[in-house]
From Swiss-Prot:
Gene3D superfamilies: Lumazine/riboflavin synthase. Catalyzes the formation of 6,7-dimethyl-8-ribityllumazine by condensation of 5-amino-6-(D-ribitylamino)uracil with 3,4-dihydroxy-2-butanone 4-phosphate. This is the penultimate step in the biosynthesis of riboflavin. GO terms for cellular component: cytosol; riboflavin synthase complex. This is 6,7-dimethyl-8-ribityllumazine synthase. The active site is at H89. It catalyses: (2S)-2-hydroxy-3-oxobutyl phosphate + 5-amino-6-(D-ribitylamino)uracil = 6,7-dimethyl-8-(1-D-ribityl)lumazine + phosphate + 2 H2O + H(+). Pathway: Cofactor biosynthesis; riboflavin biosynthesis; riboflavin from 2-hydroxy-3-oxobutyl phosphate and 5-amino-6-(D-ribitylamino)uracil: step 1/2. It holds the Pfam family DMRL_synthase. CDD domains: Lumazine_synthase-I (cd09209).
Length: 154
């Protein structure tokens, strides 16, 4: 059997953008740091990493679409944090953000990763942003690196 998989290394010219939803910035700043750490650990150069800031998770799909259309990046890592409150707002924002990122990703020929936390509590978000459950920003960047390299093999 022939196994095809993406490697976890970057060449020195690879350009990746992190799109960060600033809302819940105490969490999302940690996700960005995790994503940056993964980029550098896997061989990326800091000057080839861009950070695009948007107000909240709902704005991620639009910024993703514009970033892809700019043709400046080889891959894009989206991060954010949507934390459940006492209204249905969480359900709408998390669902539409997920659908929007998926739709943009599938309609363009560029790897995109989804590092948007959707948690019931702030404690769960903190756990996923660098404490007990690792850093999902780091994982999202690792995923997009692997998918970028896989796309070169397919």
């Amino acid at each position: 059997m022939n196994i095809i998989e993406g490697k976890l290394n970057l060449d020195s010219n690879t350009k990746i953008a992190i799109i960060n939803a600033r809302f819940n910035h105490i969490i999302t700043d940690r996700l960005v740091e995790g994503a940056k750490d993964a980029f550098l650990r896997h061989g990326g150069k800091e000057e080839n990493l861009s950070l695009i800031l948007v107000p909240g998770a709902f704005e991620l799909p639009y910024a993703l679409k514009k970033a892809i259309e700019s043709k400046k990046f080889d891959a894009i890592c989206c991060v954010g944090a949507v934390i459940r409150g006492s209204t249905p707002h969480f359900d709408y924002v998390s669902a539409e953000t997920t659908k929007g990122i998926a739709n943009v990703s599938l309609n363009h020929n560029i790897p995109v990763s989804f590092g948007v936390l959707t948690t019931d509590t702030i404690e769960q978000a903190i756990e996923r942003a660098g404490s007990k459950a690792g850093n999902k920003g780091f994982e999202a960047m690792t995923t997009v690196i692997e998918m970028l390299n896989l796309s070169k093999e397919l």
